[in-house]
Amino acid sequence: MAFPQRFSDLPEYAFPRLRTLLDSHAPGAEPIVMTIGEPQHAFPDWVPGVIADNAAGFGKYPPNDGTPELQAAIAGWVQRRYGVAVDAGTQIMPLNGTREGLFNACIALCPEEKNGKQPVVLTPNPFYQVYAVAALAVGAEPVFVPATDATGNLPDYASLSEDVLTRVAVTYICSPANPQGAVASAEYWADLIGLAERYDFQIFSDECYSEIYRDTAPTGALEMVNKLGADPERVVLFNSLSKRSNLAGLRSGIAVGGPKSIARLKQLRAYAGAPLPGPLQAVAARAWSDEDHVTANRALYQEKFAIADDILGGVQGYRPPEAGFFLWLPVDDAETATMKLWREVGVRVLPGHYLAREVNGVTPGAGHIRVAMVAEKNDMAAGLIKLRDCLY
């Protein structure tokens, strides 16, 4: 039997790869897991009641485009958060998790050719792995652009050659960045949107960590498109309740963009999508409408930022994250450091290069480990102290 080759060169996914590295070795102490970005804070206490009140919806097919209540809740959040008025019926699509949207947007919106050539999809490097798979799925060439200390931990897309830029169809950007915690400034967004206008490509803006920050809410792509008066089709915004509301298991994400782009996403969903079940759409509608639990959740992370700064502030090369809940810590060799932490003190982290691709012999992240600050704060502090004392 013949199988397609388009995904044959994909490296092993980060977490199975980590298990291969560590699981044959006993931890040096009671394990403290700081690998996956799965929030451990409590989700809102009203969630079970909303599911129960809407349980009859499990017997019905859910609407592909989302209930009117969910669409209105998302539009209201976009207006409050970014000051941008969007049409709930034509500019919003609820997603069954943001990863679905980030993947399907490339299928729905990336053209087969750009200027008569194979299209290019740009992605930061390191990056959320779905970006590259989406590019391969549509026959585009993924181009991995370093996002390192030298570039402010965001990709410098303008530095690419004219040959590459004229073929760009889609650009992925993550702000706040996973894994580095860097935030795109208004100036960065303006430059990127200007580049997109000049070379006629779309920006897929992954902003799933936008509600976890220190002091100032990160600027968003949709907000800047509106301020600049750019083409509203230029950007598709993606966000989620996973981090904002500690509802990773709900699988509720959103795509917000121009009517033409959203119409194409909806058309694909009608043929091949899996909408969120009705009772879960009811939970999502309430979550997008409520900011009290988000503010309380952010305060917990702000405490964690302060704890991390206190414990690691004396470590050479430590850079406090601007937002998100990952630490991106410098080490000599990521796998060696990861193994040392596990075998000596039972702290489990992720080698940075597991989230990156090698380009011209260089793999961004090879000198870093990613540490998730998702555990209860005392457990997190204990893990960071062990990490500091073991590695530094």
Task: Tell me what each language-model feature is.
Residues 1-11, 21-54, 69, 79-392:
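PLP-dependent class I/II
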Residues 61-66:
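A short, structured active-site edge motif that brings together acidic residues
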